[in-house]
């Protein structure tokens, strides 16, 4: 059975977890109504593409 050979330090564990962050989705303003929407999707407020 696999067991850790040595204990990892707090810093090493934190460095490994730097890639666990949530990606921010890109948002743009709708050219029709000015509301924020995701690119290449229908605007939720006015329905314009």
Curated annotation (Swiss-Prot):
The keyword Ribosomal protein is assigned to this record: yes
MF-aspect GO terms: structural constituent of ribosome
GO terms (BP aspect): translation
One family name in Pfam for this protein: Ribosomal_L32p
Top-level taxon in the UniProt lineage: Bacteria
InterPro entries: Ribosomal_bL32, Ribosomal_bL32_bact, Ribosomal_zn-bd
UniProt GO cellular component terms: large ribosomal subunit
Alphabetically ordered keywords of this record: Ribonucleoprotein, Ribosomal protein
Family membership: Belongs to the bacterial ribosomal protein bL32 family.
Entries under PANTHER family matching the protein: 50S RIBOSOMAL PROTEIN L32, LARGE RIBOSOMAL SUBUNIT PROTEIN BL32
Protein name: Large ribosomal subunit protein bL32
Gene: rpmF
């Amino acid at each position: 059975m696999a067991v850790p050979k040595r204990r990892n330090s707090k810093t090493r564990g934190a460095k490994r977890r730097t890639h666990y962050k949530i990606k921010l989705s890109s948002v743009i303003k709708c050219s029709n109504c000015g509301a924020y929407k995701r690119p290449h999707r229908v605007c939720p407020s006015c329905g314009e593409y």
